[in-house]
């Protein structure tokens, strides 16, 4: 049925739980996984001297994002290794995480996206899904399995 599962993560607790559940599903199906992380780009600065105290330079931002991506994707890699599931990881820079998830699923020919119901920003009271999950469901042309903690 499903042979290649894209598992996006933002590093939130629910996203990490979803990643582990996605790996378990992949093992049960005999599928491989691709862990995916989309990071926001650094805001360009014109003059370093004008950078407010506490703000990172673009290079510092890049290093922080790389460290965060390694940490977030490491959860998926560790779960996949323990389960004996083939795994690769991808990290991109994007202002639009849902679009990046859709593009990655298409580019890598994933036949399922397995993602958390919501990420870092959480849910509004009237929502069942987070905004990025909703966008992937609405705009992707592939199956999406949404993991929701009960």
Feature locations, PLM:
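Short, hinge-like loop/turn segments at secondary-structure boundaries
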Residues: 50-54, 106-108, 131-132
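A short acidic, glycine-rich active-site loop
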Residues: 55-71
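Glycine-rich, Arg-bearing micro-motifs that act as flexible, cationic patches
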Residues: 112-138
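Structural beta-alpha unit
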Residues: 75-113
């Amino acid at each position: 049925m499903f042979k290649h599962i894209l598992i996006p993560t933002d590093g939130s607790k629910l996203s990490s739980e979803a990643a582990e559940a996605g790996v378990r599903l992949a093992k049960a199906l005999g599928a491989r996984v691709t862990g995916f992380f989309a990071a926001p780009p650094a805001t360009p600065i014109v003059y370093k001297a004008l950078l407010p105290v506490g703000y990172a330079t673009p290079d510092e931002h890049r290093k922080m994002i790389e460290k965060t991506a390694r940490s977030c994707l490491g959860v998926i890699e560790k779960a996949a290794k323990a389960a004996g599931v083939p795994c690769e990881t991808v990290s991109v820079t994007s202002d639009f995480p849902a679009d990046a998830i859709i593009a990655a699923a298409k580019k890598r020919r994933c036949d399922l996206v397995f993602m958390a119901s919501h990420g870092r920003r959480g849910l509004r009271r009237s929502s069942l899904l987070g905004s990025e999950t909703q966008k992937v469901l609405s705009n992707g042309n592939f199956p999406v399995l949404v993991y929701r903690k009960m």
